[in-house]
Amino acid sequence: MNIINLPELNYEVFFVFIELGLIFGSLGVVFLTNIVYSAFLLGLVFVCISFLYLLLDADFVATAQILIYVGAVNILIVFAVMLINKPQSLQFLPSWTVGDTITLILCTSLFFLLISMILSISWSNIFSIAQSNKIGEQVLKSSVQGIGSSLLIDFLLPFELLSIVLLVALIGAITIARREKKVKLQKNRTLQVTKDSFIL
């Protein structure tokens, strides 16, 4: 599917929906205290980023974005959170700290810096993507073939090591969850013994 060939109005509407998904998803990841909801909203952000790659006619990068970040990293985060099973607070907005103030100042400064850079660029001098479609297709084909051969020939060992790293992270989450369950069981047994001795 070549989204770049859509009519201009549909293209702009699609872009607006993607940006809204990115903005609200990112705000939800930051402000929600429930980690499970934050993880799912992070997956929404990753999907919206892959749609941006589709708008740029980079199908392979969009597919890799979904497979790696949504299919691997985000699912791993969800499984780890579900296994750890931390008690979640019912408060929607967390308490404000000094670190939050510093982060807000830095993010606001970065936002206005990006806005000033965008406004200072002369966009009329940038060539349209449609004019360089043929060159882009040739580069995409060569880059996809190059990436595939590099992953399976030159970088096969690091590629396999990445999967081992994800597996180690999942095993670590399971181990932490089992330790917490053992500690809870020991505390419950201690409390039960104390109650029984008090009754006797």
Curated annotation (Swiss-Prot):
Pfam families xrefs: Oxidored_q3
Gene Ontology cellular-component terms listed: chloroplast thylakoid membrane
Tree of life domain: Eukaryota
Protein name in the entry: NAD(P)H-quinone oxidoreductase subunit 6, chloroplastic
Keywords from the named record: Chloroplast, Membrane, NAD, NADP, Plastid, Plastoquinone, Quinone, Thylakoid, Translocase, Transmembrane, Transmembrane helix, Transport
Subunit-level organization: NDH is composed of at least 16 different subunits, 5 of which are encoded in the nucleus.
Upper classification of the organism: Eukaryota, Viridiplantae, Streptophyta, Embryophyta, Anthocerotophyta
Reactions it catalyzes: a plastoquinone + NADH + (n+1) H(+)(in) = a plastoquinol + NAD(+) + n H(+)(out); a plastoquinone + NADPH + (n+1) H(+)(in) = a plastoquinol + NADP(+) + n H(+)(out)
Protein's job: NDH shuttles electrons from NAD(P)H:plastoquinone, via FMN and iron-sulfur (Fe-S) centers, to quinones in the photosynthetic chain and possibly in a chloroplast respiratory chain. The immediate electron acceptor for the enzyme in this species is believed to be plastoquinone. Couples the redox reaction to proton translocation, and thus conserves the redox energy in a proton gradient.
Source organism of the structure: Anthoceros angustus (Hornwort)
PANTHER family tied to this protein: NAD(P)H-QUINONE OXIDOREDUCTASE SUBUNIT 6, CHLOROPLASTIC (PTHR48479:SF1)
Family: Belongs to the complex I subunit 6 family.
Residues that span the membrane, as ranges: 13-33, 35-55, 64-84, 101-121, 156-176
Topology class, membrane: Multi-pass membrane protein
Subcellular location: Plastid, Chloroplast thylakoid membrane
EC nos: 7.1.1.-
One Gene Ontology molecular-function label: NADH dehydrogenase (ubiquinone) activity
